[in-house]
Amino acid sequence: MDYKSGLIPDGNAMENLEKQLICPICLEMFTKPVVILPCQHNLCRKCANDIFQAANPYWTNRGGSVSMSGGRFRCPSCRHEVIMDRHGVYGLQRNLLVENIIDIYKQECSSRPLQKGSHPMCKEHEDEKINIYCLTCEVPTCSLCKVFGAHQACEVAPLQSIFQGQKTELSNCISMLVAGNDRVQTIISQLEDSCRVTKENSHQVKEELSHKFDALYAILDEKKSELLQRITQEQEEKLDFIEALILQYREQLEKSTKLVETAIQSLDEPGGATFLLSAKPLIKSIVEASKGCQLGKTEQGFENMDYFTLNLEHIAEALRAIDFGTDEEEEFTEEEEEEDQEEGVSTEGHQ
């Protein structure tokens, strides 16, 4: 039994393995040396250097003017930001395991027979492999198409030369796109910062506005309490005066009532001598009591409190006119009015 053959992966496994060994930049199998990023993704060192240089165009090393500061770029697979020191990509660790796997894979592929159909065949000449590139039509084709077929009058070139050129062009495009993605990510970060700062500034001005209105509420409440206190004081003074008058009139009423009772009792006295003895003083007291009825009175409208009314329409209008940026406009308007008044005074003086 061939135990070794059982260790060799089948075709599908080899294809899956090959996909894992493809560089996301050049889209080819990793070229040694292979470097591993902090995010655990792998790149050819050359490809890593290409995107690093594209993202940091002013950073040079290995023969150029050495920049003492590092740079950064983003992993093309996961967009994780990779921060470099002054050594650049040469400071990244090599992935020797991946390099060994590549060697084993290549050795296994070289020992396997070439599968039928692994090389693209010409559609016009099914037995011919595609081995040249038509520069005129910009399509790959076979030699028979150039000699006998549709591309006789076209300019062609070896497939390998065009292959290498377009690979290089595609790699450059990828590097340019990755650098562009980094710039877009930078813009996104700046816009996110703008959102954050906008929210912070909005919160700050809201707080300031709330404090200013709270101060206005406090002034209004203080003024309201002051004016209500003045009304209450006036009310108490008037009530004290009225209650004092009521007390005086009640005392007078009580005296008059007693005199009336005494006078009625005197009228019931049957004896003339007895009646005459008390009648004269009683009449005198009644006359004096009648004169005492001329006590103080309240003036007409004494109860009126209308003089405490307020006209707050102009203040209400000023409150309704509150808006952002009106302070400078009002100051400018007041300055204009003062200038107009000064001009009017100077004109009258000349006349």
Swiss-Prot record:
The gene is Trim63. The keyword Coiled coil applies. It is an enzyme of class 2 (transferase). The lineage of its organism: Eukaryota, Metazoa, Chordata, Craniata, Vertebrata. CDD domains: Bbox2_MuRF1_C-II, RING-HC_MuRF1. It is found in: Cytoplasm; Nucleus; Cytoplasm, Myofibril, Sarcomere, M line; Cytoplasm, Myofibril, Sarcomere, Z line. It comes from the Eukaryota. Its EC number is 2.3.2.27. Residues 189-269 form a coiled coil. Pfam families: zf-B_box, zf-RING_UBOX. Residues 326-351 are annotated as: Disordered. Pathway: Protein modification; protein ubiquitination. A zinc finger (B box-type) spans 117-159. This is E3 ubiquitin-protein ligase TRIM63. Keywords: Coiled coil, Cytoplasm, Metal-binding, Muscle protein, Nucleus, Transferase, Ubl conjugation pathway, Zinc, Zinc-finger. The keyword Coiled coil applies. A zinc finger (RING-type) spans 23-79. PANTHER family: E3 UBIQUITIN-PROTEIN LIGASE TRIM36-RELATED (PTHR24099), TRIPARTITE MOTIF CONTAINING 55 (PTHR24099:SF17). One of its GO terms (cellular component) is M band. GO terms for molecular function: titin binding; ubiquitin protein ligase activity; ubiquitin-protein transferase activity; zinc ion binding. Residues 326-345 have a biased composition (Acidic residues). Induction: By interleukin-1, dexamethasone, lipolysaccharide and indinavir. Up-regulated upon muscle denervation, immobilization and unweighting and more generally upon muscle atrophy. Up-regulated upon sepsis. Down-regulated upon aging. Zn(2+) binds at residues 122, 125, 145, 151.
